[in-house]
Amino acid sequence: MREIIKPRSHCSGLVLYHCYEFGHAALRPARMALDSCRLLLNPLNPLTYTVAGRSAIAACEVLERATRRYARPAFGIKSARINGRWVQVQEQMVWHSPFCHLLHFKRDNRGAHGEPPLLLVAPMSGHFATLLRETVKAFLPHRDVYITDWQDAREVPLSQGHFGLDDYVDTVSGIFRLFDGNVHVLAVCQSAVPVLAATALMEAAGNRSVPLTIMLAGGPVDTRISPTAVNDLAKERGLDWFRQNVITQVPWPAPGQGRRVYPGFLQLSGFMLMNLDRHLQSHRAMVAHLVRGDSGSAQRHRKFYDEYLAVMDLTAEFYLQTLKAVFLKHLLPRDLMTSRGRTVRLGEIHHPALMTIEGEKDDITGSGQCRIALDLCTAVPAAHKQHYECPGVGHLGIFSGRRFRTEIVPRLARFMHTHDSRRPGGRPAGLATLRRRRDQPRACSSRAPRARLAVPWSLTFSDPKRVLWRRSSARLVSRRLT
């Protein structure tokens, strides 16, 4: 799946990111001036109580927010309501690689009952994993939650190597092995394809560490079905057009300077142009809220767009390989997708139960594109397959919002509960056996269980430029889980 990034015949794409950064730097004094208008909100200022004063303040805030660079938000989940009482939730990073952090939202012992945890595989599609904050909150009353927190490519030094679709599949496979099969997986949007590929390859190799269940939410498994504007654009332009026009280099002084990426600001522009009228109306409504003094509605607007406008860069190789395999060649449903020279055949999947979720009004992943996975995974018994299409729900609504909490979450929770104990002999829930007890000495004793290697060798040796680990140093990975 290694996509070769061909040299360009022109440099317009290469300087695109530099022009964007220059524009941000040039507007910095203006943003500071606009931000200083917040002083007008002081209750001692008489203008605060006039329509003219509030109108000026609202205009300044909208302009400042339109030119701001939005950093990655924090999850900020401190508690969860379980069985009518609030319990503490701790956010822990239990494993990491240069391009992915595995976060664990661990509930207080009063909320844990030994259920297999849920692993959320976040999409690597331009937004941070924090876009699934509401998804994490919705499942914490049911079980512990893990999530893949993909890293911004502009923040990863070029010395850390490349990250393509094969590396994504390897990362997912490695995380599956951490749980030794005692985990449920929810793949959101783009991540559905590599999750299915990783599972199929593990099944073909006889690896029993595949998940108990795989739930796919709006995944583009076969984009030939009900093509959307996104699918049509990919076919109309072709791979070479995207390579020449949207691939650029990270500028100085970012840590990933020199890395070829698909910048997040281009992805965000595409998302917003798909629903431009809705976004303009939302900002007009915010101005009206501020003029009327409706701080509650304005704060909800700020909260949503602080998340929505925070974007990350994707490596060029991952973007182009995904574009080719998923949107142009449709390799996965045709059993033509390969990873490290191994052919991915969905018919090999037979252990996990499978559920698909779609939104009736999804304008990114068309109706049937995700559901087709049930037909392609022919070895999964019909009794272990389920599908739900949420009426009147768009793409974001299949993993956030009121309808998600009231209609989708209960169905997913019942599906997981049904298959919790279907496969005996798994490890205890979560990564318990991989963590070293705090009261144990650091030296290994004959009575202490030996931790398995946390990272598969394919992750370690996937790039020839990386420094090869020794087996002794690989044991340090398990210590990171303490």
Predicted regions and their residues:
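Alpha/beta-hydrolase-fold enzymes
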Residues: 1-51, 181, 198-317
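Conserved alpha/beta-hydrolase "acid-adjacent" motif
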Residues: 363-369
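Gly/Ala-rich beta-loop-alpha elbow adjacent to hydrolase catalytic centers
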Residues: 187-195
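Conserved acidic catalytic loop of the alpha/beta-hydrolase fold
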Residues: 155, 167-183, 196
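Catalytic active-site module of serine/aspartate enzymes centered on a nucleophile-bearing elbow/loop
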Residues: 386, 390-436
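Short, surface-exposed "cap/lid" segments of acyl-processing enzymes
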Residues: 79, 87-89, 93-154
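N-terminal targeting or regulatory segments adjacent to alpha/beta-hydrolase or S9 domains
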Residues: 1-85, 434-437, 442-444, 454-465, ...
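Short beta-strand/loop motif that positions the catalytic acidic residue
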Residues: 356-358, 362
